[in-house]
Amino acid sequence: MNTAVILTARKERDSQIPYPLLPIDGKRCLIDRTLQLLRELHYERIILVVGYCHEMFQRFAAPDVTLVYNAEYEITASMGSLALVKDQIDGDFLLIEGDTFFEKQLLERLSAVPHGNCISYTEESGSGDECYIETRNGFVTKLTKDRHRVCRFEGEMIGVTRLCQTTFLRMIQEWERSSNPYLNYEYLLTDV
């Protein structure tokens, strides 16, 4: 697996600058750090889906980084952005939410998974944008942003997921039949 997709299109409610571009250590921003980690792990194809303030992301374009513009970022959610890369995905890949801070070890572990899907999760953060996880026998049975729908709370998604191509293609098929532009990719993960 040598491909990663980073979703960065949305406009944050409380910031004029996209979260992935805010400095995290005085000089680097989150996208700088994420790209560095992916390169250290020999990812050769990185697709950055941009929308709000898309021109601010142009500096990241490189031979190994392709920018895809979601012109409808204001009226679509994460699945709308993810669907834009359907013609560029030819195998399994890492899906990363651009405003997510994570350890290199997480990428190493997900990259080492030989096949299938793998969702990373942690304890509840209280960020207000959680996607809660319920599992049964080691398998995810429910993903929801509504905590009231979870009987056996396991945690929340981190925002870094290994997706197999078969699942991704099923998600795309469901998206193309959907009438809801605000659909988040997390919901389709358990629907397919």
Feature-to-residue mapping (PLM):
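N-terminal nucleotide-binding beta1-loop-alpha1 segment
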Residues: 1-17
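Conserved N-terminal catalytic core of the sugar/cofactor nucleotidyltransferase
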Residues: 2-6, 28-93
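Cofactor-binding loop segments of dinucleotide-utilizing enzymes, especially the Rossmann-like FAD-
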Residues: 7-10, 51, 98, 122
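Short glycine-enriched, charge-decorated loop/helix-capping segments at active-site entrances
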Residues: 18-24, 177
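Conserved beta-loop-beta/alpha segment of the NTase-like Rossmann-fold superfamily
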Residues: 59-136
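Conserved core of the sugar-phosphate nucleotidyltransferase
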Residues: 103-179
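Catalytic core and acceptor-binding pocket of nucleotide-sugar-dependent glycosyltransferases
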Residues: 179-192
